[in-house]
């Protein structure tokens, strides 16, 4: 496969081409994807030998190159650094549909790297990278049960659209990414504007039709350039040892799993495992370490199989709940006295404390990635400390999981956030997971709803989230509501659904089997709605509406509208004027290009003072108006009076009084307050004032009046002609 080969098709009205054989030829498989003007190279490499251990070491990287959009990276080094949140989320998005399609027991390391070379804003590099990852794997010698494909789906005026453009996405009420094989769906990620379960299911199935077409397209590529798959040594337990361990643990594991409380159950299961491991240690076998590792793996599989059998056949969950039963709920608001809003949400042994912070709009987050520069005024961050599951270990920066869960919560709550005009604040939510036994991301959504209501944020409606699970044995399946950690770990699906009472706002699905049918998806969505409404009822019983007043410690923001041409007057030369206002009042000021002014401070009196100053600066003088101002400067020809902040006018000496004034100081002194009338604003904007126009003209007594000389008008005479 040394010569370049190109395969083309149409994708959402744009040309899609896959080029193989020219680039990255030393990788196990590589493909250059051209979608419109978007270009992404994906390379897949698989190690020849398996790694020790009982896990599959798959790594997916998505690398954004700033040159792809004609930008130079910021910062001192001027080169790409750690992945952006968007790149991290994209890597997770690609990993999730690919991982289930490697064989059970696959232990060879696989690394997939997608590098973005060029970006057309209307042709998603994320979807190109997902397709490229599948192509790179299916044409390589790495055993992989693909192909897969992914598409974005939108809905505009009730009509579904594949890979919507930026303009279309802004009008869409669904933002869905769906991935899968020709036969089934195995990954869903969605945000929505309170859409129904039926509409979301139709969007998923609409996307799957396009996925089928892309999988057929990849089959053509496989037939032309696909390599023969290599033989891989899969991790398989020794049948005799497996039977021996099963016999030793029979009955004991079942009883341990049925222990309802999490910590007690974990201890009981650990006791069973430890007892059996100790029995093998006592045998003093030659290859003891290898045998003990295999026994531990077999015990893990026995635990998994027994939990799945209890749920599927006996309909018994580890904690004794029914399959559609929600764990006990409790919640509280206002726990933290100095924060702007807080909410504690507990569901069984999962607990999240969410905190809401309000800030001026200037504290938004600037997003400068491969798209156009934008800013976010709403953020949700998720933290998962190890003490939440009773473990120790180093505390590191947020990883892929924490970034992903934070983004899911943000997507779920985004639709209910009030507009900038309604609520001119930057809103940051932080969810601290204090206990975890499954569904912590959904607990963070519930806690965040409580925190915003406690902070007085006028959200459109409360949002709740629930995680659904699945245990599928052959054709028999059981859907679980509100899964706990063990059911998530050993189950076949983690299906998170968040929304209001009127519809879905976010959806995320990961599965460990090949895919799901429409029937299972439909039932899971219906069961999730029942659980969501139950949780919403609990949340609104704790706090039913936003608090009428913001916290005393939250900034109070007042909005003022001025003419855009007056912005320069408020800012002043070099920012002198606006900085003077900030220094005098201690407020924070943001001015938009349309003339909207946001003034923020915890002290309302200072807010009002700043508004008064700005109103003075932008006030326009009108002829005939009367003002009271201070004398700021005196010259021989008159006095300059400050009418209001930033606006002076001249009272000419002849306009000080009706009688003749010898010196200005005879009437006015520096700092005097004087009432004046505007008599003229000239073409240069200079203001002329009069004091005497407001004074009554004094009448002289009859005896004091001097007789006026009679005015005589003389006729004009001709000058004598010169001779």
From Swiss-Prot:
Region (Disordered) residue spans: 692-723
Cofactor: Mg(2+)
Single GO BP term: mRNA catabolic process
KH domain boundaries: 555-614
InterPro entries the record matches: ExoRNase_PH_dom1, ExoRNase_PH_dom2, ExoRNase_PH_dom2_sf, KH_dom, KH_dom_type_1, KH_dom_type_1_sf, NA-bd_OB-fold, PNPase
Keyword line: Cytoplasm, Magnesium, Metal-binding, Nucleotidyltransferase, RNA-binding, Transferase
Residue ranges with Basic and acidic residues bias: 693-723
Primary location recorded for the protein, binned into one broad class: cytoplasm
SUPFAM superfamilies recorded: Eukaryotic type KH-domain (KH-domain type I), Nucleic acid-binding proteins, Polynucleotide phosphorylase/guanosine pentaphosphate synthase (PNPase/GPSI), domain 3, Ribonuclease PH domain 2-like, Ribosomal protein S5 domain 2-like
Subcellular location: Cytoplasm
Top-level taxonomic group: Bacteria
EC number: 2.7.7.8
Binding site for Mg(2+): 488, 494
Catalytic activity from the UniProt record: RNA(n+1) + phosphate = RNA(n) + a ribonucleoside 5'-diphosphate
Domain S1 motif residue range list: 624-692
Molecular function via GO: 3'-5'-RNA exonuclease activity; magnesium ion binding; polyribonucleotide nucleotidyltransferase activity; RNA binding
One GO cellular component, as annotated: cytosol
Pfam family, one: RNase_PH_C
Class of enzymatic activity (EC top level): transferase
UniProt-listed PANTHER family: POLYRIBONUCLEOTIDE NUCLEOTIDYLTRANSFERASE, POLYRIBONUCLEOTIDE NUCLEOTIDYLTRANSFERASE 1, MITOCHONDRIAL
Recorded family membership: Belongs to the polyribonucleotide nucleotidyltransferase family.
Physiological role: Involved in mRNA degradation. Catalyzes the phosphorolysis of single-stranded polyribonucleotides processively in the 3'- to 5'-direction.
NCBIfam families: polynuc_phos (TIGR03591), PRK11824.1 (NF008805)
Name recorded for this polypeptide: Polyribonucleotide nucleotidyltransferase
Species: Listeria monocytogenes serotype 4b (strain CLIP80459)
Taxonomic classification: Bacteria, Bacillati, Bacillota, Bacilli, Bacillales
């Amino acid at each position: 496969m040394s010569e370049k080969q190109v395969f083309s098709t149409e994708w959402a009205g744009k040309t899609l081409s896959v080029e193989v054989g020219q680039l990255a030829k030393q990788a196990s498989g590589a493909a250059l994807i051209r979608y419109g003007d978007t270009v992404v190279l994906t390379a897949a490499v698989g190690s020849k030998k398996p790694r020790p251990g009982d896990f599959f070491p798959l790594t997916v990287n998505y690398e954004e190159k700033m040159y792809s959009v004609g930008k130079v990276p910021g910062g001192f080094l001027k080169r790409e650094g750690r992945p952006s949140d968007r790149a991290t989320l994209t890597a997770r998005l690609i990993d999730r549909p690919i991982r289930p399609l490697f064989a059970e027991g696959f232990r060879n390391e696989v690394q997939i790297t997608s590098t973005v070379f060029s970006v057309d804003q209307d042709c998603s590099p994320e979807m190109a990278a997902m397709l490229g990852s599948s192509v790179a794997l299916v044409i390589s010698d790495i055993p992989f049960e693909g192909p897969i494909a992914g598409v974005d789906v939108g809905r505009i005026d009730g009509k579904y659209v594949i890979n919507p453009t930026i303009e279309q996405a802004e009008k869409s009420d669904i933002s869905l990414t769906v991935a899968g094989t020709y036969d089934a769906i195995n990954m869903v990620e969605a945000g929505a504007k309170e859409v129904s379960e039926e509409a979301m299911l139709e969007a998923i199935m609409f996307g799957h039709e396009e996925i089928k077409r892309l999988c057929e397209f990849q089959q053509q590529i496989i037939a032309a350039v696909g390599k023969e798959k290599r033989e891989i040594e899969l991790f398989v337990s020794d049948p005799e040892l497996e039977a021996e361990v099963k016999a030793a643990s029979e009955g004991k594991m079942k009883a341990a799993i049925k222990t309802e409380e999490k910590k007690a159950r974990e201890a009981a299961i650990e006791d069973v495992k430890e007892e059996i491991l100790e029995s093998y240690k006592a045998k003093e076998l030659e290859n003891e370490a290898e045998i003990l590792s295999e026994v531990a793996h077999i015990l893990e599989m026995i635990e998994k199989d027994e939990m799945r059998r209890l749920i599927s056949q006996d309909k018994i969950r580890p904690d004794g709940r029914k399959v559609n039963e929600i764990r006990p709920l409790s919640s509280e608001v206002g726990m933290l006295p100095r924060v702007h809003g807080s909410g504690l949400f507990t569901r069984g042994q999962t607990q999240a404390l969410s905190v809401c912070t309000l800030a001026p709009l200037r504290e938004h987050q600037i997003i400068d990635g491969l798209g156009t520069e934008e800013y976010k005024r709403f953020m949700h961050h998720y933290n998962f400390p190890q003490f939440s599951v009773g473990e120790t270990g180093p505390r590191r920066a947020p990883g892929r999981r924490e970034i992903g869960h934070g983004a899911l919560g943000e997507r779920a709550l985004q639709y209910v956030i009030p507009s900038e005009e309604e609520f001119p604040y930057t809103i940051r939510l932080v969810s601290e997971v204090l206990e975890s036994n499954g569904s912590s991301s959904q607990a963070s959504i519930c806690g965040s709803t409580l925190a915003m209501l406690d902070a007085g944020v006028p959200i459109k409606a409360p949002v709740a989230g629930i995680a659904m699970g699945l245990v599928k044995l052959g054709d028999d399946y059981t859907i679980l509501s509100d899964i706990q950690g063990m059911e998530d770990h050993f189950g076949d699906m983690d299906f998170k659904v968040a929304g209001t009472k009127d519809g879905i706002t976010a959806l995320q699905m990961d599965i460990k089997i090949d895919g799901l049918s429409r029937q299972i998806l439909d039932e899971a969505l219906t069961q999730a709605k029942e659980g969501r409404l139950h949780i919403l009822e609990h949340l609104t019983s704790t706090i039913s509406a936003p608090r009428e007043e913001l916290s005393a410690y939250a900034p109070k923001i007042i909005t003022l509208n001025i003419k855009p041409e007056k912005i320069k007057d408020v800012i002043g030369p070099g920012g002198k004027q606006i900085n003077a206002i900030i220094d005098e009042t201690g407020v924070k000021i943001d001015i938009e290009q349309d003339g909207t002014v946001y003034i923020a401070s915890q002290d309302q009196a200072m807010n009002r003072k700043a508004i008064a100053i700005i109103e003075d600066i932008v006030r326009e003088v009108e002829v005939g108006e009367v003002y009271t101002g201070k004398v700021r400067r005196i010259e021989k020809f008159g006095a300059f009076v400050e009418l209001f902040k930033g606006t002076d006018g001249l009272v000419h000496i002849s306009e000080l009084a009706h009688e003749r004034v010898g010196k200005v100081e005879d009437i006015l002194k520096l700092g005097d307050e004087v009432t004046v009338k505007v008599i003229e604003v000239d073409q240069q904007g200079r203001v002329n004032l009069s004091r005497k126009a407001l004074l009554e003209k004094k009448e002289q007594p009859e005896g004091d009046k001097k007789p006026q000389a009679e005015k005589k008008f003389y006729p004009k005479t001709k000058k004598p002609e010169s001779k």
